[in-house]
Amino acid sequence: MKQYTNAIIFGIAIVASSIFLGKAYTDRSKADGEIRVTGLGKTDFSSDLIVWEGEFSAQNKDLKQSYLTLEKNKAAINKYLVNKGIKSQQLIYSAVKTDENFKRLYSSDGKFIGEEFVGYELTQTVKIESNDVDKIEKVSREITELLNQGVQFYSESPRYYYTKLANLKIQMISKATQDARLRAEKIAEFSGGRLGKLESARMGIFQITGQNSKETYSWGGTFNTDSREKSASITMKLTYKVE
């Protein structure tokens, strides 16, 4: 009799467990009745703003003579750039930086015995910002012609920017959202359901890389300034209910 009673209790427990698990599975399925998709918006564009900088200097033991030489070099640079079609008001010169240079002295047996003053070095930079990308790009390559005038000019690589970035970002968000919705509709269609209302939307990181470059995306966002031709991309993560 006791064994029979135990069997009944065990059977009831199994049935109860089955009902509970079945309900839990149904509730989980309802909770999971949604589609999560990621859409991509991407486009290529060309920079419309160039920033180019260069540095020149003068060295002499006499500070005044160093400054006179620097001013002479500056005048030669200014004339050269204006002759290349750059307006003088576009030339932004930095303040003059002054450094004292010393030579380390050693004894015949290699021991350090002190320093000798060798002169002053005065350094100045010039910067140009322009929407005429072709012109400034050409000047940055030809600036070494100043060497023929005895002017040592150290040219940096140009940096490229896009002034309509805010509008471009809006376009990319729109493209990414459309792409994500299309993916969600296809998933719902293939699963026999119908796409419901949008539950959530989350924007990814805006990335700008050089076209056909080996640059990789970063968590904080990539912002390329080395390439004139660029690619922009952004992702949108959407969650839809499924009906």
Please describe what each predicted stretch is.
Residues M1-I92, V96-E243:
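Short, charge-dense linear interaction motifs
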